[in-house]
């Protein structure tokens, strides 16, 4: 509506999601809390799925999810309009998708496939989108992405070492690595860049890259300059 933007200390995606609730229900307590509460609820089944992938034990996953439902931080942050529950949802989603990706890739390697299947690539694209949403909501997602990258390189390294010990080709792992570098570099960056399109229009600018860089530098300067007394 041409109103000045007073908050640029975080990437804009999370604020768009909160605004979506306000569009649906107005600028009311329900409107500004709706999306955060919704994703806070969806965190529970995603957490169950993550535990199921991690432990392959339904009872452990159920108990862990039940304990998560009673976590006071989760309950509190999901009831207010903050970015924390939003970025937590996307980080947990990207972790679950990544774990599913590793399991699927390991199964294909054990079956002797020469390269990643279309299912693996689609899963990687979805995971890349989750990474992009996390980073575009809050830079906390970037640190989670770095941790995931270390796990990805580590898994590929382990698979290559196993292939060499068995005297087989590590072609699958190399192709998966190449696809991963491409997907996890391009998809998150594109989503992060496109999240600044409304910001560019609000500022009356025409260069999207310049707007993204300017706001990102402002965010970095703001957070690096925070002091506590």
Where are these predicted regions, by residue range?
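Short helix- or helix-capping micro-motifs
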Residues: 64-69, 76, 96, 131, ...
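Transmembrane-lumen/periplasm boundary regions of multi-pass, lipid-linked membrane glycan transferases
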Residues: 1, 145, 152-229
């Amino acid at each position: 509506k041409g109103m000045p933007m007073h908050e640029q200390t975080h990437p804009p995606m999370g604020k768009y999601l909160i605004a979506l609730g306000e569009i649906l229900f107005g600028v009311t307590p329900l409107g500004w809390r709706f999306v955060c509460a919704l994703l806070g609820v969806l965190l529970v089944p995603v957490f169950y799925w993550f535990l199921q992938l991690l432990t392959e034990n339904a009872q452990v996953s159920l108990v862990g999810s039940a304990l998560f439902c009673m976590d006071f931080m989760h309950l509190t942050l999901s009831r207010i309009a903050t970015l924390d529950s939003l970025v937590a949802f996307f980080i947990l989603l990207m972790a679950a998708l990544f774990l599913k990706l590793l399991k699927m890739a390991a199964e294909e390697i054990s079956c002797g496939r020469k390269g990643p299947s279309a299912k693996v690539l689609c899963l990687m694209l979805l995971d890349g989108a989750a990474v992009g949403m996390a980073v575009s909501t809050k830079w906390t997602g970037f640190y989670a992405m770095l941790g995931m990258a270390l796990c990805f390189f580590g898994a590929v390294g382990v698979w290559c070492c196993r292939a060499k010990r068995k005297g087989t080709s590590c072609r699958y792992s190399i192709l998966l690595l190449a696809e991963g570098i491409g997907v996890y570099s391009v998809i998150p960056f594109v989503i992060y860049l496109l999240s600044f399109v409304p910001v560019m229009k609000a500022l009356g600018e025409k260069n999207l890259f310049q707007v993204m860089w300017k706001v990102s530098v402002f965010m970095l300067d703001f957070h690096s300059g925070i002091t506590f007394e």
